[in-house]
Regions:
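N-terminal Rossmann-like NAD(P) cofactor-binding subdomain of oxidoreductases
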Residues: 2-207, 212-214, 314-317, 353-355
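Generic C-terminal helix-cap and adjacent flexible tail
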Residues: 3-4, 260-263, 347-355
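Short glycine-rich or small-residue beta-strand-to-loop segments that form or flank ligand, phosphate
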Residues: 8-11, 154, 253-255, 324-327
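Conserved active-site and cofactor/substrate-binding residues in soluble primary-metabolism enzymes
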Residues: 17, 134, 158-165, 214-222, ...
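Alpha-helical scaffold segments in soluble metabolic enzymes
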Residues: 21, 25, 165-169, 222-226, ...
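C-terminal substrate-binding/catalytic lobe of Rossmann-fold NAD(P)-dependent oxidoreductases
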Residues: 33-76, 179-185, 189-324
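Active-site catalytic microenvironments for nucleophilic, acid-base chemistry
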Residues: 169-173, 257, 342-349
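NAD(P)-dependent Rossmann-like dehydrogenase/reductase catalytic/cofactor-binding core
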Residues: 308-311, 315-356
Length: 356
């Protein structure tokens, strides 16, 4: 595909929250033609019938949901997005790849390099372990060149995105220790998906904040995998996610130990400059990572509906800790937006296409 080309794309599982966000981004993408959307629940109905907000936008009034069929999908699209639960996505990926179609998978099925780790965290054997060696972890800021040449892209999870982008450059540069990392995340309820589930009903979540998945949330597996790659050694972290009564957004705070002591104001100033330089070198040219100004801290309201991660940090001389905070929209940078960013790299498009 040339830089000026248009690519035909399809979405399997287009009626979920991530699928809906994908539809929104692709309807307005200048070089993507949405040719197929699937949902067993809404077969025969158009996009705008199920999502009235899309009425009058592109093909939304005419494109109908179909039953997911790998043969039909491969015939209709050059690249297929899988917005399906883990365990289900892999079955479609295998057939689509065999048909010569490229796949961007939003599930967890291809994020992990080791099938034994997948089984440990997801409770069942990996459905397509033979594909793991060629799957590329689809975080552009960390794996841009590999994404460009991939057949199978594993779009990262929402929590990992909020944790990895702040921390990976510092580990790689040796500015923080690989031990004792603590990450606490607060997430909106859309992260649980659209399927009705009593713990995530409005009456259960409103006026309430609660932890879940402690001490071994599934996303911990890919977080530790990617941090270990950055550090060049095994990294184990403490991760505690919390559900908060908002629709979308993740705010993550991490507590890290710098490799240098900073017991005096002068030492703190030197370390602060090194941290500033490291993060600037990693992200000053990145379109979707915003390093916030001094005195400004991330706020989920400021990233809602955007593909940006907002990042700030503070040194605490009293405890000897580096505190990093980040905010993302879990459905955009934490899911569909990051997947479209990978599409752009895969096709040689402007990386920001469909994401502004």
């Amino acid at each position: 595909m040339s830089d000026a080309s248009t690519v035909k794309v399809a979405i399997v599982g287009a009626s979920g929250y991530s699928g809906e966000e994908l539809v929104h981004r692709l309807l307005h993408h200048p070089q993507a033609e949405l040719t197929e959307v699937t949902s067993r629940q809404y077969v025969g109905q158009t996009l705008s019938q199920i999502f009235p907000r899309f009425a009058g936008q592109g093909v939304a009034d005419t494109l109908q949901f179909t039953e997911p069929d790998s043969v039909a999908l491969a015939a209709a699209a050059e690249i297929v997005f899988l917005a399906l639960p883990h365990g289900v996505a892999a079955r479609y990926a295998q057939d689509l790849l065999n048909a010569g179609t490229k796949v961007i998978d939003l599930s967890a099925d291809f994020r992990l390099n080791d099938p034994a780790v997948y089984e440990e965290f997801y409770g069942k054997p990996h459905p397509a372990p033979e594909l793991l060696s060629e799957a590329v972890y689809g975080m552009p800021e960390l794996h841009r060149d590999n994404i460009r040449s991939a057949r199978l892209i594993a779009s990262p999870g929402c929590y990992p995105t909020s944790i990895l982008l702040p921390t990976a450059p510092l580990l790689k540069a040796g500015l923080i220790k690989s031990t004792g990392i603590i990450a606490n995340s607060l997430s909106g309820v859309s992260g649980a998906g659209r399927k009705p589930d009593v713990p995530f009903l409005y009456a259960e979540c409103n006026e309430s904040v609660r932890p879940y998945g402690i001490p071994k949330h599934r996303h911990l597996s890919e977080i530790e995998q990617e941090l270990s790659l950055a550090a060049g050694e095994q990294v184990t972290i403490q991760f505690s996610p919390h559900l908060i009564p908002v629709t979308r957004g993740i705010l993550t705070t991490q507590y890290l130990a710098p490799t240098e002591n900073f017991k005096t104001a002068e030492e703190e100033q030197v370390l602060a400059q090194r941290l500033t330089t490291c993060l600037a070198e990693a992200y000053s040219q990145e379109p979707f990572v915003r390093l916030l100004a001094d005195g400004v801290l991330p706020d989920t309201k400021h990233v809602t509906q955007s593909n940006c991660l907002d990042l700030a940090w503070r040194l605490d001389r009293r405890t000897g800790r580096l505190i990093m905070t980040s905010a993302i929209d879990n459905l955009v940078k934490g899911a569909s937006g990051q997947a479209v960013q990978a599409l752009n790299l895969l096709c040689g498009f402007d990386e920001t296409a469909g994401l502004q």
